Amino acid sequence: MGKLIRMGPQERWLLRTKRLHWSRLLFLLGMLIIGSTYQHLRRPRGLSSLWAAVSSHQPIKLASRDLSSEEMMMMSSSPSKPSSEMGGKMLVPQASVGSDEATLSMTVENIPSMPKRTAKMIPTTTKNNYSPTAAGTERRKEDTPTSSRTLTYYTSTSSRQIVKKYTPTPRGEMKSYSPTQVREKVKYTPSPRGRRVGTYVPSTFMTMETSHAITPRTTVKDSDITATYKILETNSLKRIMEETTPTTLKGMFDSTPTFLTHEVEANVLTSPRSVMEKNNLFPPRRVESNSSAHPWGLVGKSNPKTPQGTVLLHTPATSEGQVTISTMTGSSPAETKAFTAAWSLRNPSPRTSVSAIKTAPAIVWRLAKKPSTAPSTSTTPTVRAKLTMQVHHCVVVKPTPAMLTTPSPSLTTALLPEELSPSPSVLPPSLPDLHPKGEYPPDLFSVEERRQGWVVLHVFGMMYVFVALAIVCDEYFVPALGVITDKLQISEDVAGATFMAAGGSAPELFTSLIGVFISHSNVGIGTIVGSAVFNILFVIGTCSLFSREILNLTWWPLFRDVSFYILDLIMLILFFLDSLIAWWESLLLLLAYAFYVFTMKWNKHIEVWVKEQLSRRPVAKVMALEDLSKPGDGAIAVDELQDNKKLKLPSLLTRGSSSTSLHNSTIRSTIYQLMLHSLDPLREVRLAKEKEEESLNQGARAQPQAKAESKPEEEEPAKLPAVTVTPAPVPDIKGDQKENPGGQEDVAEAESTGEMPGEEGETAGEGETEEKSGGETQPEGEGETETQGKGEECEDENEAEGKGDNEGEDEGEIHAEDGEMKGNEGETESQELSAENHGEAKNDEKGVEDGGGSDGGDSEEEEEEEEEQEEEEEEEEQEEEEEEEEEEEEKGNEEPLSLDWPETRQKQAIYLFLLPIVFPLWLTVPDVRRQESRKFFVFTFLGSIMWIAMFSYLMVWWAHQVGETIGISEEIMGLTILAAGTSIPDLITSVIVARKGLGDMAVSSSVGSNIFDITVGLPVPWLLFSLINGLQPVPVSSNGLFCAIVLLFLMLLFVISSIASCKWRMNKILGFTMFLLYFVFLIISVMLEDRIISCPVSV
């Protein structure tokens, strides 16, 4: 150039023409490029990538929608000189994809200008949450009023400002240069981008909010920017911004230009907001307008896997916490509060968002002034360190913990207590389940239609499913489990604790599974806790109210099950304290169940050992009493008593030993049979009982008459006190009354004194009578004979026990238990075998008592022997008849499901009512009660599980619809309606069994099924969830469930202590009290869940 100039004017002229020529070409070329670019940008579908980016912004658009137009105008109206720092910062997030620069440039454009304005105008802007886009927003608004106002504000001007700082530097420089990139983009197509961005970006900018603007200022410095980027790192956004493939940035930009800026700048402030909005507000709108399945997918441009949605999701969770905490030290507490509020705004709770937005402006503005106030990354406090001055609060959301950690907890906690409390909403982004909405199919009726009365259909369907679940369990599932136990040769006790408990608790187990994996709620926990309280209070209380007599409970089965239940409840309460269930906690609960099953395997041995330990003190007491009168003979008698006890205890174990297996087919009449074949089962049981009692009363009348005739008038009163002490421990065993028919007064006294527990009374009474008679009146020879006879009797009883056990496997142990508990004059089988020896022993005792040692005693003894033998023969006949009846009942219970048309009209109506349930089951599931179908028990087992799962899903779904219509949560539905519905079949069975005299089986079964629910029904879904999601903990936070579990624990202690204080008997007053306590529990639980009252024991 210089040479040409020197050469001369002509050459100089030629040179000038050349320069003009090239300038014109460049100008024309630039115009063509600008024009074509403008046209492409103007057409929404011109660039698919741009359109996608715009659509991704739509969620942000919703965010802008949150702010009133006035607020937005305020933001734009208060023009603030764009700070270069701000512009640069904003640009940083925007600088992204080179190819999409044009598209992004518009967004960037807007963003940069927004930051500038934000710096000064943030106070006003903050109100809108879109303050960053204040001036820019205005322009955007003008460009595209349809789009969020903020976006409309976008102007190329902002891009120019950014251009000033524009530097095409690698992402590493992004902090400083990224604004430049943004400017570049702005230069290219500010207005076109403005439009699109106007539609989508505005909301993005709004989403970014003043917080973003503030952050950009903070990020103006490289260090500040770094902090911003770190924030993005925490969330996938950071990754996008820093890693930033330009695409990533672009994608982020496109999807949420403000979002990225926001996150980078405002410590994820806007990002949370964006997320919140996305979750609450934009999902419908944004998605619709964007016409993209996932607006976040745009962000995903850079990160398809972690599209904007992903980023938003992660950021929201993290940023939520972060934003809450992000405040500048420089800013006053008020600022901090405002900042937090702003964060809250973006948070998924819309309530906070409005107020937060208002407060945020001031804070953001101040922060803008202080560029070093870059929020620290949620996960990386290091960023905080960099901007120590201003990075005051950065909520660090750890991936596992749900709790947010704040540098300055005082402000954060005071401002946002709920956010800091452990709740699924604050869970780290890594947790896949943030309790989204339940995965239910669309309902035929809207909420308004249901409230007009159509909800009645849902209520009816829910009740109908309760019946269906009971039929599936009773008719197919439990029989299939019975076949499995036979094949595996599992003992009755273990089967009752495992398979039979599973049969009765299957609905609760599947409800828990549905609650964890489908409805994403605590409905399973509520159902299991509510069912536990229902079983303990309502079922046991109803049994005692409707039983024909006071329930005398065997203490060992109840003590054993309640001990395990208390241990399991304590574990559950401890695990609930942090509102997260880790995988190892679920495993511990399962191991507790395995320990329970192991204990049931050795139940008889443990029971014998425990009772032997407990029996030493009462026996010593008897020894002392006897030693006072007859020291010499007392020791012999006591040794004999202990031997007899060891031999006799096993025969008593049959009662209640498998008490957890209330679902045994020998005991349980299925719901279908009850509804069709015995519409009034309680009445039939009552009639049968009355017949039995009449025959027993006749026998009892004959006995006293015979005794009165044979007894001499002169009875020795001195011997009576000793005799009354002896039977004292007899309270629980009615079988003792049979062996000592005339000793009912003594039994009453024994119950009142209650010196010794349970079964010990029987042997103690007999032993002491022998002591008395042998020591005082009998010659030694007679005493030896008596001892031998007694030993034979015990051996015979032992044999009877073996026989009873065998029968228990084939026909159920109920016969033996019936004999002992009903008072049918003796233990059923042992009576037959030891009738003669038994009679002789008693005749000897009574003869000695009556005759003293006189000569007339022998004749009287002979007469008594004859009379008692006759009575016992009659008793044996009655017992045989009862056994036959019970066998018939068992056969009836074992009959396969029949679809025969019933006779009466009432039964026909019930048949038609149940046909929609029974007919599909009859078609699809083999009935293992038919011999030819027994080999298909595996198909029955699997088929019934599928039906139970389907019915449980319908039950939970319709319960959710009913709760949604009425306005109550799924947790409350589980605690109340679902818990009662799944437990009603057990309630009916328990009442029938209790009226038959097997009260302790009904009571112990209620506790046993609860053990299965807590140690299998709850931890199995939790463990599966953790295994599927990489051993992540399961969130179980709920307002009232923790307190409900504590209440359940207290109720259990009350029930057991009350029963024990009443000598293991349950009267009607105690039953009525438990009945009322159940309703008190329901009222308190509902009030806790609805936050009407606060839980005093919550952590």
Curated annotation (Swiss-Prot):
Post-translational modification remark: The uncleaved signal sequence is required for efficient membrane targeting and proper membrane integration.
Domain of life from the UniProt record: Eukaryota
Reactions performed catalytically: Ca(2+)(out) + K(+)(out) + 4 Na(+)(in) = Ca(2+)(in) + K(+)(in) + 4 Na(+)(out)
UniProt record, GO biological process: calcium ion import across plasma membrane; calcium ion transmembrane transport; calcium ion transport; intracellular calcium ion homeostasis; long-term synaptic depression; long-term synaptic potentiation; monoatomic ion transport; potassium ion transmembrane transport
Compositional bias ranges of the Polar residues kind: 123-134
UniProt topological domain (Extracellular) ranges: 1-452, 519-522, 585, 929-935, 993-1010, 1061-1068
Biased composition (Acidic residues): 757-769, 857-892
A Pfam family: Na_Ca_ex
Main location: membrane
Illness the protein is tied to: Night blindness, congenital stationary, 1D: An autosomal recessive form of congenital stationary night blindness, a non-progressive retinal disorder characterized by impaired night vision. CSNB1D is characterized by a Riggs type of electroretinogram (proportionally reduced a- and b-waves). Patients have visual acuity within the normal range and no symptoms of myopia and/or nystagmus.
Region (Disordered): 123-150, 169-199, 284-304, 690-901
Gene Ontology MF annotations: calcium channel activity; calcium, potassium:sodium antiporter activity; symporter activity
Segments crossing the lipid bilayer: 453-473, 498-518, 523-543, 564-584, 586-606, 908-928, 936-956, 972-992, 1011-1031, 1040-1060, 1069-1089
Protein name per UniProt: Sodium/potassium/calcium exchanger 1
Residues bearing carbohydrate: 290
Free-text function comment from the UniProt entry: Calcium, potassium:sodium antiporter that transports 1 Ca(2+) and 1 K(+) in exchange for 4 Na(+). Critical component of the visual transduction cascade, controlling the calcium concentration of outer segments during light and darkness. Light causes a rapid lowering of cytosolic free calcium in the outer segment of both retinal rod and cone photoreceptors and the light-induced lowering of calcium is caused by extrusion via this protein which plays a key role in the process of light adaptation.
Source species of the chain: Homo sapiens (Human)
